[in-house]
Amino acid sequence: MVRILRWFIRLYQIAISPLLGPRCRYIPTCSQYALEALQTHGAIKGVWLSSKRICRCHPWGGSGYDPVPLKAIRFISFHQIDSQTHHVAVPFRDRLMKQNLSNHLG
Protein backbone atom coordinates (compact mmCIF):
# COMPACT_ATOMS: atom_id res chain seq x y z
CA MET A 1 0.00 0.00 0.00
CA VAL A 2 2.78 2.43 0.94
CA ARG A 3 4.54 1.65 -2.32
CA ILE A 4 1.46 2.57 -4.38
CA LEU A 5 0.93 5.80 -2.44
CA ARG A 6 4.58 6.74 -2.86
CA TRP A 7 4.28 6.08 -6.61
CA PHE A 8 1.32 8.49 -6.90
CA ILE A 9 3.18 11.18 -4.96
CA ARG A 10 6.26 10.81 -7.16
CA LEU A 11 4.00 11.01 -10.24
CA TYR A 12 2.61 14.28 -8.87
CA GLN A 13 6.13 15.60 -8.18
CA ILE A 14 7.36 14.76 -11.68
CA ALA A 15 4.32 15.48 -13.87
CA ILE A 16 2.04 17.98 -12.12
CA SER A 17 4.08 20.02 -9.64
CA PRO A 18 6.43 21.54 -12.26
CA LEU A 19 3.39 22.87 -14.14
CA LEU A 20 1.97 24.54 -11.01
CA GLY A 21 5.22 26.11 -9.86
CA PRO A 22 6.42 26.44 -6.26
CA ARG A 23 3.39 27.01 -4.04
CA CYS A 24 4.11 25.20 -0.80
CA ARG A 25 4.58 27.43 2.25
CA TYR A 26 6.51 24.81 4.21
CA ILE A 27 9.89 23.12 4.18
CA PRO A 28 9.94 20.26 3.24
CA THR A 29 7.26 20.64 0.59
CA CYS A 30 3.93 18.93 1.20
CA SER A 31 4.68 16.17 -1.29
CA GLN A 32 8.10 15.50 0.24
CA TYR A 33 6.50 15.58 3.70
CA ALA A 34 3.98 12.96 2.51
CA LEU A 35 6.78 10.70 1.25
CA GLU A 36 8.63 10.98 4.56
CA ALA A 37 5.45 10.45 6.60
CA LEU A 38 4.62 7.28 4.67
CA GLN A 39 8.14 5.96 5.09
CA THR A 40 8.31 6.78 8.81
CA HIS A 41 4.78 5.94 9.97
CA GLY A 42 3.28 3.60 7.36
CA ALA A 43 0.17 3.99 5.21
CA ILE A 44 -2.58 4.87 7.70
CA LYS A 45 -0.77 7.36 9.92
CA GLY A 46 1.27 8.64 6.96
CA VAL A 47 -1.89 9.52 5.03
CA TRP A 48 -3.38 11.12 8.17
CA LEU A 49 -0.29 13.29 8.79
CA SER A 50 -0.05 14.23 5.10
CA SER A 51 -3.73 15.20 4.96
CA LYS A 52 -3.37 17.41 8.03
CA ARG A 53 -0.31 19.06 6.50
CA ILE A 54 -2.04 19.74 3.16
CA CYS A 55 -5.00 21.28 5.01
CA ARG A 56 -2.59 23.66 6.81
CA CYS A 57 -0.91 24.74 3.56
CA HIS A 58 -2.95 27.75 2.44
CA PRO A 59 -2.37 31.52 2.26
CA TRP A 60 -3.71 32.09 5.79
CA GLY A 61 -1.94 29.08 7.28
CA GLY A 62 1.50 28.75 8.76
CA SER A 63 4.83 28.53 7.00
CA GLY A 64 8.44 27.58 7.64
CA TYR A 65 10.13 24.40 8.75
CA ASP A 66 7.65 21.63 9.60
CA PRO A 67 9.28 18.17 9.71
CA VAL A 68 7.52 14.82 10.00
CA PRO A 69 7.23 13.93 13.70
CA LEU A 70 9.28 11.04 15.04
CA LYS A 71 7.57 7.81 15.95
CA ALA A 72 5.92 7.66 19.36
CA ILE A 73 8.14 7.58 22.41
CA ARG A 74 8.38 4.17 24.02
CA PHE A 75 9.23 3.45 27.63
CA ILE A 76 11.77 0.90 28.78
CA SER A 77 12.47 -0.19 32.33
CA PHE A 78 15.80 -1.08 33.83
CA HIS A 79 17.18 -1.67 37.32
CA GLN A 80 19.83 0.48 38.91
CA ILE A 81 22.18 -0.56 41.71
CA ASP A 82 19.63 0.31 44.40
CA SER A 83 17.15 -2.21 42.87
CA GLN A 84 14.47 0.40 42.25
CA THR A 85 12.84 0.33 38.84
CA HIS A 86 13.25 3.52 36.86
CA HIS A 87 11.55 4.41 33.59
CA VAL A 88 13.28 6.27 30.80
CA ALA A 89 11.56 7.78 27.75
CA VAL A 90 13.60 7.10 24.62
CA PRO A 91 12.47 7.84 21.06
CA PHE A 92 13.21 4.83 18.84
CA ARG A 93 13.51 5.17 15.10
CA ASP A 94 13.71 1.43 14.53
CA ARG A 95 13.71 -1.93 16.30
CA LEU A 96 17.49 -2.36 16.02
CA MET A 97 18.11 0.84 17.98
CA LYS A 98 15.64 -0.30 20.65
CA GLN A 99 17.27 -3.73 20.87
CA ASN A 100 20.78 -2.28 21.14
CA LEU A 101 19.74 0.14 23.88
CA SER A 102 17.87 -2.57 25.80
CA ASN A 103 20.94 -4.85 25.65
CA HIS A 104 23.18 -2.02 26.83
CA LEU A 105 20.96 -1.10 29.79
CA GLY A 106 20.53 -4.69 30.91
Curated annotation (Swiss-Prot):
Matches recorded under Pfam families: YidD
Key word Membrane present in the record?
yes
Membrane topology, as annotated = Peripheral membrane protein
Annotated InterPro entries: Membr_insert_effic_factor_YidD (IPR002696)
What keywords would UniProt list here? Answer: Cell inner membrane, Cell membrane, Membrane
Main localisation, per the record?
Answer: membrane
Domain of life of the native organism? Bacteria
Give the GO cellular component terms, alphabetically: plasma membrane
Looking up SMART domains in the UniProt record yields: Haemolytic
What are the coiled-coil residue ranges? none
Q: Which family does it belong to?
A: Belongs to the UPF0161 family.
Source organism per UniProt: Acinetobacter baumannii (strain SDF)
Question: What name has this protein been given in UniProt?
Answer: Putative membrane protein insertion efficiency factor
**Purpose of the protein:** Could be involved in insertion of integral membrane proteins into the membrane.
Localization annotation: Cell inner membrane
